[in-house]
Design a protein with these regions (language model features):
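Class I S-adenosyl-L-methionine-dependent methyltransferase catalytic core
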Residues: 1-192
């Protein structure tokens, strides 16, 4: 099976569109003054919209998330899917609340079970389809709680079929339409 996990070099460096960052920050009830960790800074789409105090990790800058051990109030990020189990495991040691955007099929019953065993529960979920991304995604907000919440807030949002990086019509991950983003990979207007 050719999954991200099994590839010699995983291709899971996917930059978060600014519009999705805005949705994430609003959805997770991020408050100014919270000490926030962005653990996959990339080009700064999330990090640049956070107010102080804030910290980041970025493997390309030698700041490995797995070497970060300082407690924070909240983690907001788009983690790499190829190492998601270990990523969650380390997340549980750093905060009492996190907001991640992950592929819909990455939120498996086993992952939720392990999350709950570590005292974390999903309190909010937002389902969306991001044009040019492979699959639907969940924005999940998880909090460390004494017991499972009685209700979970669930929402969905339709982001249309225009690329969130450059505004052009998008055919998803297949076909000729995706090339408009790859050509602009180094431009600031398009973060793909």
């Amino acid at each position: 099976m050719n999954t991200i996990k099994n590839r010699p070099k995983p291709n899971d460096k996917i930059y978060t569109p600014p519009k999705v960052v805005d949705i994430m920050l609003k959805f997770c009830d991020y408050k100014e003054g919270d000490l926030v960790l962005e653990c996959c800074k990339g080009k700064g789409a999330i990090y640049d919209k956070l107010s102080e105090p804030k910290q980041y990790c970025e493997i390309d800058e030698g700041l490995d998330f797995f070497n970060h051990h300082k407690k924070v109030d909240i983690i907001i990020s788009n983690p790499p899917y190829s190492i998601l189990d270990n990523w969650f495991k380390h997340t549980y040691t750093l905060c009492n609340k996190f907001c991640y955007i992950i592929g819909m099929y990455s939120l498996t019953p086993k992952r939720v079970e392990v999350m709950n065993e570590n005292g974390f529960y999903i309190t909010k979920m937002l389902l969306t389809k991001i044009p040019s991304w492979f699959q639907r995604s969940y924005i999940i907000v998880c909090e460390k709680l004494e017991q499972e919440p009685e209700t979970i807030i669930f929402k969905s949002i339709n982001l249309g079929n225009k690329c969130l990086y450059c505004g052009q019509p998008c055919g998803g991950m297949r076909g000729k339409n995706i090339k408009h983003c790859k050509r602009k990979a180094n431009e600031t207007i398009c973060r793909y």
